[in-house]
Amino acid sequence: VKYNRVNKKVEINGLNISKCSNEAVALLLLGIAHENGLKISKDNTFSFLAAIADMNQYSPVCDFLEEAQKAYNGKQDYIRDMWANFELDPESGQDPDFCFFLFKLWLISAVRMAFNKGAESAQGVLVLVGAQGIGKTRFLYMLLPFKEWGAEGVSIDPQVKDDVIKSTGFWIVELGEFGE
């Protein structure tokens, strides 16, 4: 039993429960306990499951980033390579060096948030502007080795609990359309 800090779900090795809520997982365990003659209350099942999962927290994103750091040869500039995929509007008057600096800060912030235990909040949002079909969403998934680490078209109203839960269950999210 372990707790995935990215998707905020309890996981049990050997059981495919990826689509289940934490409450459903606890009820499943309660049923297994009762089938095997164990007398345990629903409340205790929830408490024990939460305690065990809390002691076994992990982040697949952090694991991936740590492995990527070990594999990095120190020579290739992957950030600059990614930046080369973007085009700034020449009529906007934007300073390309400053925009690249902000892009790097955003990437660093994404990595910091992966390792964050809740003490910090992200500073800044990467905003990609352009016509449909030019690759803005594709860029999101280019960053992510596993599609389930990201979400697209998310809308966030901080007053709506479900919006907050949905948006925080991923490493990187693409927010829905912005107005001009």
Regions picked out by a protein language model, each given a short descriptive name:
Residues 53-172:
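P-loop NTPase catalytic core of nucleic-acid-dependent motor ATPases
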Residues 11, 28, 34, 130, ...:
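Generic detector of intrinsically disordered, low-complexity, polar/charged segments
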Residues 1-77, 81, 94-101:
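N-terminal nucleic-acid engagement/recognition segments and initiation subdomains in replication
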Residues 170-180:
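Conserved AAA+/SF3 P-loop NTPase catalytic/coupling segment centered on the Walker-B
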Residues 2-5, 9-14, 85, 113, ...:
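Residue-level preference for alpha-helix termini and adjacent loops
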